[in-house]
Amino acid sequence: MLGIDIGSNTLRAVFMDEYFNKLKSEEFIIATAKNMQNGLISNEAIQRLFNALKILSEKYNLSQAKAVATAAFRNAKNTEDIFIKIEKEFQLKIQVIDAKTEAKLSILGMQERLKTLKLFRKNLSYCDLGGASCEISNDYFSKSYDFGIISFYERMNFKAIKPNAYVNFFKKHPKNLAYIKDKKLKIHFSSYPVHFKQIFFEAFNVIKEAKKNLKGKFFVLNSGVPTTLCAYKQNIKYKDYLEESVNGKILKRKDFFNFALKIWNLEQEKAKIYLGENRKKYLIAGSMILFALFDKQKLIVIDDGVREGVCIAHFKNIKF
C-alpha cells in the first residue's frame, strides 16, 4: 500500500506491505506553507505539489493510495480547489486531518520503528516539528502548536542592528564571554551574525507555551530537522540520505545550536548538496526552535512518521 503525507514543507510517500516492511519511500520538497501571508497556498507551491504527484503517478497507482494533508492545508482558503484538481488529474483523494489525528498517525509510525529497533519503552514523549505546526504528545497529552520551520521563518521581521559597544568589546576580548553565566545574555553580547541572533531570541519567544507543557525525560523526534542534522553529522549528502543511517540516533540540545551555526556559514552550493535545495534557512529556524524547546532531555531520532502511520492504520484497521 502507498501512504502519502502532504505536509507544509514536504510530500512524503511510502510503499509498505502488510508486515510493515517499507519497500520504497519517496520525498519531495513542496514548501506549501511558504508565502502564505494571504491565506492561500501559492501557485508556485501548487506547481511543486503537482510535479511531485506526477512523478509518483508514473511509479504507483495513485487511485489505490491513501493520502492525508496537514497544517498548511488545514489553514489555506484554496485547499478544496486544489484537491478537486488533484482528484481529477491523478484520481487521488486527499483527506485533510486535524492536529490530533496527525499526532496519532505520526506516533503510530514512530512507535512501530522503535519496536523494530528495540527502543520502545513506556512514558516516551514525541515531538513532530513540521513546516507550519509542531505536535507534542505523550500517553496522556497531545497538543498542536502554531509554529513550524517555514511559518516561523516567514514571520521573522529581520532588522539591521549595528553592534553596540559591548558586542565590540567582546569581539576584541572573546575570552571574557566565559564570565557571563546567563546563556541568552552571552549570545546577545557575542559576535554571531545579527540575523542569527534574532532567530535565536525569537525561537525562545514562540516556544514559551509549549515549553510549559513539556514533560518527560525521553523525546522521540521525527521531522526533517533532526534527521538532516544526523545525516549531516555523518557527512551524508541529501541525495544519498538513508533512513537507516539516522534511525535510533541520540541527539543533545546543543547539537541543534551547533548545526544551525555550521550551516549558517555554509555556502549555497554546498548547502544544496548536503541539505537539499532551498532548505538551509528553514533548517536553521527549526534547529533554533528545538534548541530553545529542550533542555536536558534525551532526544531519539526516528525517520518514520505520518506516512508510515497511514499505512499501519490501514493494515491494523484503525479508523481516522
Task: Enumerate the language-model features and the residues they cover.
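Conserved hydrophobic/aromatic positions in well-ordered beta-strands
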Residues: V14-M16, S137
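Beta-strand initiation motifs
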Residues: F20-K24, K143
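Short glycine-aspartate micro-motif
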Residues: M1-D5, L124-D128
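A structural signal for short, well-ordered beta-strand segments
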Residues: K24-I30
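Helical "lid/coupling" subdomains associated with nucleotide-phosphate turnover
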Residues: A31-I55, F73-A76, E80-N123, N138-F320
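Short N-terminal binding/cap micro-motifs at the start of the first secondary-structure element
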Residues: T10-V14, N35
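Ser/Thr-glycine-rich phosphate-binding loops at phosphate-binding pockets of nucleotides
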Residues: S8-T10, M110, G130-I136, G224
